[in-house]
Amino acid sequence: MNHSPQSARPVSIMRRFLDSEAAGGITLMAAAALALIVANSPFAQTYFDALHLYIGPLSLAHWINDALMAIFFLLVGLEIKREMLDGQLASWPNRMLPGIAAAGGVILPAIIFAVLNHDNPAKLRGWAVPSATDIAFALGVLSLLGSRAPSSLKVFLATLAILDDLAAVVIIAIFYTAEISMPYLGAAFITAAVLFVMNRMGVVKLLPYLISAVILWFFVFNSGVHATVAGVVAALMIPLKPAPGRPDDMTSPLHKLEHALAKPVAFIVVPIFGFANAGISFKGLEASVLGDTLTLGILLGLFLGKQFGVFGAAWLAIKTGLAEKPMGASWVQLYGVAILCGIGFTMSIFIGLLSFPSDLMQTETKIGVLSGSALSAICGYLLLRAAARPKRG
């Protein structure tokens, strides 16, 4: 039976959307906006009750933040390994500019936050919240410019965001770890060792790695180290090279898994996280929250700290000859991308949830992240759009 062009058109439009670079960011924005609407609607109580509903040993919110997000971190780990061994980060010259820029973008926001909250140890726990960049959001905004943004800028932003994610993973593992259970931690190390041995022995079937990854998650979760770290550790053990002597299957296990996870993470995992965590009820919320040093520290850290930290470090690296400016990109365009780095959404909220147990502080964190990310997205897009306009005359 032949389908008419009219009936096929919606399918092709949807397929083009899912394949576009902007799709993940747009879906995440829609999920966050929907969460804000629901949290301030007659369905608000149902929304919050559902998140606190216990399913087995954990609430729904904890299943999302501890288990579902481990899949997100598994994909992050796969991307980091691929880029470090066989991509944009495979050589030191390619690592220099995004690496130095990422360092500036982690350090300056943390300093701004610490200056505003140095006298409050409870708030100071959130120093790392404004140090993250949301790769899906940032690339989604940049991709809205299409061919008007040089491809070198997209590579720079993607590479910087991956290094940013790596820094966030290290920060979570070191600074946001609860009391350690040595038996579970020991079991986690043994499981990681099994994964490593499988890699060295040339095991290329994904199933043993995935089963071991689930076991690793269980042990890490119970050890006190944040469970999402298990996703990254498991990813680093997945083989990058395809099976030897198999000309019919030249795709490596890492590429297979990365390809299989890309769309589910972009369109299911991250939007669910966004919907579950972006819901802020403004009912009874005092205006003073906006002026609180916790909210301001995150907002200014993301909006000002990120752009000045990333651009300042990149400018210094280029001017001193340590790195080269992205090909075909102007200084204004590089600055616009630096502003986009202030879109911290997913990782910033995630670190905020680890930092603060109180609902009020989590709400202030989310307001700071949402406002700082929105300002960065709007200003970065407008500057890049203006910089891409053809000059008249």
UniProtKB/Swiss-Prot annotation:
GO molecular function: sodium:proton antiporter activity
Cysteine disulfide partners in this protein: none
Phylogenetic placement of the source organism: Bacteria, Pseudomonadati, Pseudomonadota, Alphaproteobacteria, Hyphomicrobiales
HAMAP family: NhaA
Gene Ontology annotations of biological process type: regulation of pH
Gene Ontology cellular-component annotations: plasma membrane
Full protein name: Na(+)/H(+) antiporter NhaA
Catalytic reaction equation(s): Na(+)(in) + 2 H(+)(out) = Na(+)(out) + 2 H(+)(in)
Predominant location category: membrane
